Amino acid sequence: MANVIVIGAQWGDEGKGKITDLLSKSADVVVRYQGGVNAGHTVVVEGKIFKLHLIPSGILYPDTDCIIGSGTVIDPKVIIEELDQVEALGISTANLMISGAAHVTMPYHRMIDKASEKRRGSKKIGTTGRGIGPTYADKSERTGIRMIDLVNPDRLKEQINWTVNYKNVILEKLYDLSPLNPEEVVNEYLNFADRLRPHVIDASLKIYNAIQLKRNILFEGAQGTLLDLDHGTYPYVTSSNPVAGGACVGTGVGPTMIDRVIGVAKAYTTRVGEGPFPTEAKDEIGDLLCDRGAEFGTTTGRKRRCGWFDAVIGRYAVRINGMDCMAITKLDVLDGLEEIKVCVAYDMEGKRCEDFPGSAIQLSKCKPIYKTLPGWKESTVDCRNLEDLPKQALDYLRFLAELMNVPIAIVSLGASRHQTIVVEDPIHGPKRGLLYS
């Protein structure tokens, strides 16, 4: 039995969906612990592409329970669309469960999110406009509506009538927007409730019971370490905690019940939206990585900013998350390059810095210090064992592992499940502190 957290080690979009899908075959339960429809993951199975935002990747395995935890925020319309999408492919959704403590994204959240971002002007954050931040803000203000309220008609009507009237003042007076009709919102969300009611449970208790039964549980994070509200490049972050610690808070599971943490990082670096990005390549290399890697957001469709691998970020993610091992994705994107650069440290106003700085302002002053490695001509997409990889590709992976002081357990060479090298069982080994071998 193992309880394992999968986290993003960069700015999100690292390929967590594929890695979680790969590991889900060994899991009895897959749990999503934070975020909302602002994060998307793509899974390719037998040529079929699944693009999901809220439903855990484990839904593709009929014997796996899928739980959406209390740390998430739920857009009922979107999750119903995803249920329809999955069911249309002949996949049962009876194994999907949603925490009654998860908060609900409402129409006014989306309106405020978009209007607020527009109002920021040059100081915009790069929000997806899906209402995530305002939903979490209401959670903190203790004015939010939870899933347990959604499925209670009388409670839902009472909360919506009060909250919509309150939010209308903000919409009209602050943002010059048209007010919402409380009755229309009530009717819309009552319909959502009818569809979602069978899925709403006490998720913390469900997970605890699974742990007592010694079932294998996979905790699936959204976004990445550097988008964490507390530990990311604030204010260019999300409104929740994607780091490993967020899994405990976002599911109601004690930290002593977690056995392992697996990080996921691309063989290069990307980010979406605003904020400092030391290794960003604003030249033909950046364009090449974007084109080869199909670097466009699952949620927004926005082009991702691309650059070389940043080992300073990698070391930080290993430390913050207590990472046991790492999966490196999209190694194949680097095929054919004459040389490959890796950021080993920063130059911060003339001083060498090997540790990630504590603020976005400091990070914006950092310039990458690169180590240049030889590339490889051969294609890696059909490699299924380490021995199949070009020597230079193997050396590259070893170099990354040594820089970050973390073993690499999985290497992904494409979007499909079979395009993967499993170096060692990422759930039961290797142990933290060992290097790539």
From Swiss-Prot:
Binding site for IMP: D13, E14, G15, K16, N38, A39, G40, H41, T128, R142, Q223, T238, R302
Chain sites annotated for binding Mg(2+): D13, G40
InterPro entries xref list: Adenylosuccin_syn_GTP-bd, Adenylosuccin_syn_Lys_AS, Adenylosuccinate_synth_dom1, Adenylosuccinate_synth_dom2, Adenylosuccinate_synth_dom3, Adenylosuccinate_synthetase, P-loop_NTPase
Taxonomic superkingdom: Bacteria
Main location class: cytoplasm
Enzymatic class: ligase
Family to which this protein belongs: Belongs to the adenylosuccinate synthetase family.
Function: Plays an important role in the de novo pathway of purine nucleotide biosynthesis. Catalyzes the first committed step in the biosynthesis of AMP from IMP.
Protein name per UniProt: Adenylosuccinate synthetase
